[in-house]
Amino acid sequence: NTVSSFQDILMRMSKMQLGSSSEDLNGMITQLESLKLYRDSLGEAVMRMGDLHSLQSRNEKWREQLSQKFEEIRWLIEEVRHRLKNTENSFEQITFMQALQLLLEVEQEIRT
């Protein structure tokens, strides 16, 4: 379940923040939180509308928002990969691996 994965990863990241004086993770955490909210609202919109395609064709702004989210996801993926390369801490490695997995899933989900 991606919702619980999001929660779990966000919790782990906030723990990492407390535990280390390393670079601030705030930006990444904020981005992940907004992505989670967006994804949740996307799911609700689709359920309410029933037909995603009519929603798309009616709503240019919605498409812009979507491509903006893809940009954010790509940025987060890069950021997470970068952190993965630079950490020796196994707790952090696991967290970032999970985050990466989740981001790729969400990207795939939004794409379909």
UniProtKB/Swiss-Prot annotation:
<keyword id="KW-0945">Host-virus interaction</keyword>
<keyword id="KW-1048">Host nucleus</keyword>
<dbReference type="Pfam" id="PF00601">
    <property type="entry name" value="Flu_NS2"/>
</dbReference>
<protein>
    <recommendedName>
        <fullName>Nuclear export protein</fullName>
    </recommendedName>
</protein>
<dbReference type="InterPro" id="IPR000968">
    <property type="entry name" value="Flu_NS2"/>
</dbReference>
<feature type="short sequence motif" description="Nuclear export signal">
    <location>
        <begin position="82"/>
        <end position="91"/>
    </location>
</feature>
<dbReference type="GO" id="GO:0042025">
    <property type="term" value="C:host cell nucleus"/>
</dbReference>
<comment type="function">
    <text>Mediates the nuclear export of encapsidated genomic RNAs (ribonucleoproteins, RNPs). Acts as an adapter between viral RNPs complexes and the nuclear export machinery of the cell. Possesses no intrinsic RNA-binding activity, but includes a C-terminal M1-binding domain. This domain is believed to allow recognition of RNPs to which the M1 protein is bound.</text>
</comment>
<comment type="similarity">
    <text>Belongs to the influenza viruses NEP family.</text>
</comment>
<dbReference type="GO" id="GO:0044423">
    <property type="term" value="C:virion component"/>
</dbReference>
<dbReference type="GO" id="GO:0039675">
    <property type="term" value="P:exit of virus from host cell nucleus through nuclear pore"/>
</dbReference>
<feature type="short sequence motif" description="Nuclear export signal">
    <location>
        <begin position="9"/>
        <end position="18"/>
    </location>
</feature>
<comment type="subunit">
    <text>Binds M1 protein. May interact with human nucleoporin RAB/HRB and exportin XPO1/CRM1.</text>
</comment>
<keyword id="KW-0813">Transport</keyword>
<keyword id="KW-0946">Virion</keyword>
